[in-house]
């Protein structure tokens, strides 16, 4: 066959294939796949056997049912390849119905369809059962599809009594969530058997009808068909409880209300949600397989009793995939993550990131919904790496006598987690330091070992130390881990020589000797030792502290001699011990010195005579009423003190004549009068006191005795107690003089204050506050309210320049702005008021002076104010020149009389009287 004949055949075959493909596409576009019904209902027995066929669902597919797969959301039921629904196990159904969803899935396109299956439990009597078990419910042909009829419970009357027959058990109504409608979608139809006789109106009440959420369900009042008006959401509300009512057209109740239970059938519309998006856990390195790490949890809002809410877990990825890509596994049901492989090593991988997936539908990845979370697993450190020294030997150097000095740093390496007990190093000297001169402390930052001198070393004894140090961790090593040979190192420490100070071997040195040894007496040799035996240095001595300057030291050999007499009773002696400090210095470079203390215990000798106590006393002038107790004080110590001997001297003879001493004990005696009466006064009584030293010392002391008259109780009745108290006559006189001076000063101050007060009152009476124009605003009388005198001659105000001089006329109308040209009247000089406080006399005197003043206007005289007119000599005010007060002459104020004396004094410079 040629090529020309084959080509037309190929084109013809291709054309036919294209035509067949177009026809197949046309058929598919005209075909609509899906279940024959949106819901199936069947009656079943309460007891269902395993494998029992319950009903059959029909599915129409445009490509045939060969590639279809059926599933249910219930583990109790399965669907065969032909659509037959059967039980997977023996069931005892306690409720009135069972509802579940059947899903048809196309394997190639993964497209799926769902239908609701309701299995009603047959619990009614045979008289009311119109269906056979195992068959799909046959509906009334007059009813629309899915018009499930729920008859009202019937009643029967007998003999006038109304008996209710056994009611229908109204099965729950199941509504799948997320239905696409169309809405309203019919659920069931309810009817009463009385609707054949009378018209009946139906209604429903309850949550979802007339209670929020409102109008989720409604009912056709005439036909009784109940509808759902919108898609349901089981996660929002899983069930509804309604009540159905039947009334006639007048609203009268025809039937008792019945309960309707509506259950929302769950659909797989919610993904599992993890409680946390990131989980943190930890596991020890080196853990064995099966070690628990952490638990992740995801919740699904769908029904947990169905596959929609059954969540399963799995690990999606692990990062890093070292040493194995599957180091962990997860329990699919509980979410527990455990190790599945060995080899966890923190020093290699410190952290793993694991992506965990949660899938519902029991983990079916084809049908279930999934979600993911992150699990961060930290590998925690264990002490599986012993610390190791970076080198096997270390060296250091330290001067002798130096402490708390770091002489060497020991470095270690530890691969465990820094700054943890598994990393922190602990150092221990295991040999080479029997005397404990060194310790090794750990630097908390670098983890180094610091070899520190804690006890001074001596170059003359040890010139070097060879230490062996071992290092470990604060935490013990993990099981099976052994210490490394590199955990031990040697440390060589060299000691360098320094110039050490001389020291006194016996420091403090104590010697005992009697006080009073003469100057120049050798006491002891206080020598020092130079520890630098190999330097052959000379030591010189000197005094550092000698408070009383009693001692001398030989600068070469340290011999100490006395430079003065040692006195135990001196203020420089404390508790019989005199203390001095000496200095020993070598001639090294640089020089070094040491100090030593010498303590001299002074043994007491009887070198102090006793002193009589008290120095003053008083006694009654007649004997027998009282006596004076006397004793003695001695600066020495026992046995150079008491018992004391008290006696009166023979000279003067009056002492033994007037006084007598009675011994009480070794320390006390009584001094009393020997005669019957001794005149009052102060007497000096000498008394000889002798101690018990060897040899004994005596002292004659004088006691001042105040002899005074006494009352029946033996107490002095004079002021002698003052003197006895320590106040002499001079002191008393001085106190009295001070008191008198103080009283005089107070009196003078009171007199001065009285005089000042009188002067202030006098000034106030002589000066009217309104007349004092200094620094005050002048107040002039106001002429308001009209003129009192209305009968004066107005012609006096006309042409005042033509009038005769007012001074030549008798007192009447006069000018008050001119100084009178006549002779000034002579006023009587006011006598000095002997008592300025007498206000009445002062006022009367002023009144008489005013009455005798010829220039004083009468009370009812007419005051004529100037009318300047054209002939005024004042001119313009602007012609006035300002001038200082120094340019003015105020002497004329002295001519105005005593009434203006204060003003004249103010402006004329006069002094106030």
Curated annotation (Swiss-Prot):
Glycans are attached at residues 146, 280, 409, 554, 629, 658, 699. CDD domains: Cadherin_repeat (cd11304). The chain crosses the membrane at residues 732-753. Distributed widely in mouse tissues with high levels present in brain, skeletal muscle and thymus. One of its GO terms (molecular function) is calcium ion binding. GO terms for biological process: axon extension; axon guidance; heterophilic cell-cell adhesion via plasma membrane cell adhesion molecules; homophilic cell adhesion via plasma membrane adhesion molecules; positive regulation of axon extension. It is a single-pass type I membrane protein. Three calcium ions are usually bound at the interface of each cadherin domain and rigidify the connections, imparting a strong curvature to the full-length ectodomain. This is Cadherin-4.
């Amino acid at each position: 066959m040629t090529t020309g004949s084959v080509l037309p055949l190929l084109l013809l075959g291709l054309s036919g294939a294209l035509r067949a493909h177009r026809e197949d596409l046309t058929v598919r576009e005209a075909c609509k796949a899906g279940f024959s019904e949106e819901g199936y209902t069947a009656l079943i027995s309460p007891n269902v056997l395993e494998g029992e066929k319950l009903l059959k669902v029909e599915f129409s597919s445009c490509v045939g049912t060969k590639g279809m797969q059926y599933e249910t959301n219930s583990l109790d039921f399965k669907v065969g390849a032909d659509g037959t629904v059967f039980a997977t196990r023996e069931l005892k159904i306690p409720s009135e119905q069972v509802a579940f969803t059947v899903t048809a899935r196309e394997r190639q396109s993964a497209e799926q369809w769902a239908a609701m299956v309701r299995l009603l439990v047959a619990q009614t009597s045979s008289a009311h059962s119109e269906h056979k078990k195992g068959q799909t419910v046959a509906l009334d042909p007059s009813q629309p599809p899915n018009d499930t009829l729920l008859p009202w419970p019937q009643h029967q009357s007998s003999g006038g009594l109304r008996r209710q027959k056994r009611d229908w058990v109204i099965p729950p109504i199941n509504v799948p969530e997320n239905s696409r409608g169309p809405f309203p979608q019919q659920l069931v139809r309810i009817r009463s058997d009385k609707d054949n006789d009378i018209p009946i109106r139906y209604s429903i009440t309850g949550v979802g009808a007339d209670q929020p959420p409102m109008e989720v369900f409604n009912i056709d009042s005439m036909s009784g068909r109940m509808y759902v008006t919108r898609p349901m959401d089981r996660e929002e509300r899983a069930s509804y409880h309604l009540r159905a009512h039947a009334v006639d057209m007048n609203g009268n109740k025809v039937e008792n209300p019945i309960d309707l239970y509506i259950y929302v059938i769950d659909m797989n519309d919610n993904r599992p949600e993890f409680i946390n998006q990131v989980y943190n856990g930890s596991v020890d390195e080196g853990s064995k397989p099966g070690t628990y790490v952490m638990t992740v949890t995801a919740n699904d809002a769908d029904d947990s009793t169905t596959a929609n809410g059954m969540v399963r877990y799995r690990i999606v990825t692990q990062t890093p995939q070292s040493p194995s890509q599957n180091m962990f596994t997860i329990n699919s049901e509980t979410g527990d993550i455990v190790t599945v492989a060995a080899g966890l090593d923190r020093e290699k991988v410190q952290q793993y990131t694991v992506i965990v997936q949660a899938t519902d539908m029991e983990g079916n990845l084809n049908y279930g919904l999934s979600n993911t979370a992150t699990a961060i697993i930290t590998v925690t450190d264990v002490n599986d790496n012993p610390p190791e020294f970076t080198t096997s030997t270390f060296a250091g150097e330290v001067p002798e006598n130096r402490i708390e000095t770091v002489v060497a740093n020991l470095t270690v390496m530890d691969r465990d987690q820094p700054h943890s007990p598994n990393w922190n190093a602990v150092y221990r000297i295991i040999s080479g330091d029997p005397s404990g001169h060194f310790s090794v402390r750990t630097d908390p930052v670098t983890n180094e070992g610091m070899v520190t001198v804690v006890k001074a070393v001596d170059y003359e004894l040890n010139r070097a130390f060879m230490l062996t140090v071992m290092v470990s961790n604060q935490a013990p090593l993990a099981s099976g881990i052994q210490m490394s040979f590199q955990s031990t190192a040697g440390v060589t420490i060299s000691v360098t020589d320094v110039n050490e100070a001389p020291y006194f071997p016996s420091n403090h040195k104590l010697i005992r000797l009697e006080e009073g040894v003469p100057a120049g007496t050798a006491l002891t040799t206080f020598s020092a030792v130079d520890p630098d035996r190999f330097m052959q240095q000379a030591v010189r001595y000197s005094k550092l502290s000698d408070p009383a300057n009693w001692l001398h030291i030989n600068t070469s050999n340290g011999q100490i001699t006395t430079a003065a007499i040692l006195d135990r009773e001196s203020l420089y002696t404390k508790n019989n011990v005199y203390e001095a400090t000496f200095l020993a210095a070598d001639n090294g470079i640089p020089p070094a010195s040491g100090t030593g203390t010498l303590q001299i215990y002074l043994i007491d000798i009887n070198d102090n005579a006793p002193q009589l106590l008290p120095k003053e006393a008083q006694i009654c002038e007649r004997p027998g009423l009282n006596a004076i107790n006397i004793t003695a004080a001695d600066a020495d110590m026992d046995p150079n003190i008491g018992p004391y001997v008290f006696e009166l001297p023979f000279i003067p003879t009056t002492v033994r004549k007037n006084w007598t001493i009675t011994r009480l004990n070794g320390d006390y005696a009584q001094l009393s009068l020997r005669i019957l009466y001794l005149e009052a006064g102060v007497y000096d009584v000498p008394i000889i006191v002798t101690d018990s030293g060897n040899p004994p010392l005596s002292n004659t002391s004088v006691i001042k005795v105040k002899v005074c008259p006494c009352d029946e109780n033996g107490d002095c009745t004079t002021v002698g107690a003052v003197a006895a108290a320590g106040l002499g006559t001079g002191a008393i006189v001085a106190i009295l003089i001070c008191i008198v001076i103080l009283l005089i000063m107070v009196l003078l101050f009171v007199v001065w204050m009285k005089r000042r007060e009188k002067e202030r009152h006098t000034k106030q009476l002589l000066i009217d506050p309104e007349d004092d124009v200094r620094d005050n605003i002048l107040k002039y009388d106001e002429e308001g309210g009209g003129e009192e005198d209305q009968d004066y001659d107005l012609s006096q105000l006309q042409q005042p320049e033509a009038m005769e001089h007012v001074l030549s006329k008798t007192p009447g109308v006069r000018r008050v702005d001119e100084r009178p040209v006549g002779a000034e009247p002579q006023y009587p000089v006011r006598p000095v008021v002997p008592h300025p406080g007498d206000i009445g006399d002062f006022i009367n005197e002023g009144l008489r002076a005013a009455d005798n003043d010829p220039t004083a206007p009468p009370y009812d005289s007419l005051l004529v104010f100037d009318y300047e007119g054209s002939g005024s000599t004042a001119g313009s005010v602007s012609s006035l020149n300002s001038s200082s007060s120094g340019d003015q002459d105020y002497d004329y104020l002295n001519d105005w009389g005593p009434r203006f004396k204060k003003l004249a004094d103010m402006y004329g410079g006069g002094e106030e009287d």
